[in-house]
Amino acid sequence: MAFQKRGGRRRRKVDYIAANHIEYIDYKDTELLKRFISERGKILPRRVSGTSAKNQRRLTIAIKRARIMGLLPFVAED
């Protein structure tokens, strides 16, 4: 029997930061940063969040700064 391919076209993810014209990712803007953190407290990868490489680097730096300053948790509370 022949196997049939499943699936269709996947929708291309949009860079939220570029789409909303955010030029500076501030570590104090926790509401923005929480969009890119999983429920376990880990930083979402580019393939999941859809951010560009440049914005992913900026985002990672901002999240790490916010964690050190105590604005975001390092791990999620259970």
From Swiss-Prot:
For this protein, the record's Gene3D superfamilies field holds: Ribosomal protein S18 (4.10.640.10)
Q: Which residues cross the membrane?
A: none
Source taxon at top rank = Bacteria
Which one Pfam family would you cite for this protein? Ribosomal_S18
Task: Name the Gene Ontology biological process terms.
Answer: translation
Q: Which residues form a coiled coil?
A: none
Q: Name one GO cellular component term.
A: cytosolic small ribosomal subunit
InterPro entries tied to this protein: Ribosomal_bS18 (IPR001648), Ribosomal_bS18_CS (IPR018275), Ribosomal_bS18_sf (IPR036870)
Q: Name one GO molecular function term.
A: small ribosomal subunit rRNA binding
What SUPFAM superfamilies is this protein classified in?
Ribosomal protein S18
- Relate the assembly described in the record: Part of the 30S ribosomal subunit. Forms a tight heterodimer with protein bS6.
This molecule's function is given as: Binds as a heterodimer with protein bS6 to the central domain of the 16S rRNA, where it helps stabilize the platform of the 30S subunit.
Task: Identify the HAMAP family for this entry.
Answer: Ribosomal_bS18
Query: Hey, which family's this protein in?
Result: Belongs to the bacterial ribosomal protein bS18 family.
* Name assigned to this protein: Small ribosomal subunit protein bS18
Q: What is the organism of origin for this protein? A: Pediococcus pentosaceus (strain ATCC 25745 / CCUG 21536 / LMG 10740 / 183-1w)
